[in-house]
């Protein structure tokens, strides 16, 4: 895998940025996580994304406290809102032989 770009992550505030050109991405990469979110910290986050694929597949996923995986997007660009829940919350990407550019902002 080749990764060229930048990424930031702030688990305390559940924010992240990912701006990279990748080649041969296989597997999963967690962008931001909070393993013990309290009920009063649960809020809606907005994820903006742009995905330009040269080859393979890439998905943005949300993993909820009950470890249910939800695909938020697989291609193109746009934004999606996610309601965080008490417990463990994860936002990540999964790739299958993915090559292309990925831009993601979680706020």
Which residues fall in each region the model found?
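A short beta-strand element within beta-rich, extracytoplasmic domains
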Residues: 43-53, 93
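Transition segment at domain starts
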Residues: 1-36
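Short, surface-exposed beta-strand/strand-loop-strand elements in extracellular ectodomains
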Residues: 54-72, 104
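Extracytosolic and intramembrane catalytic regions of membrane-associated proteins
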Residues: 59-61, 83, 94
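Extracellular and analogous surface-interaction loops
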Residues: 31-45, 81-86
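Short, solvent-exposed loop/turn segments in extracellular or other extracytoplasmic domains
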Residues: 73-79
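Edge beta-strands of jelly-roll/beta-sandwich modules across compartments, strongly enriched
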Residues: 58, 95-107
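A short tyrosine-centered beta-strand micro-motif
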Residues: 89-91
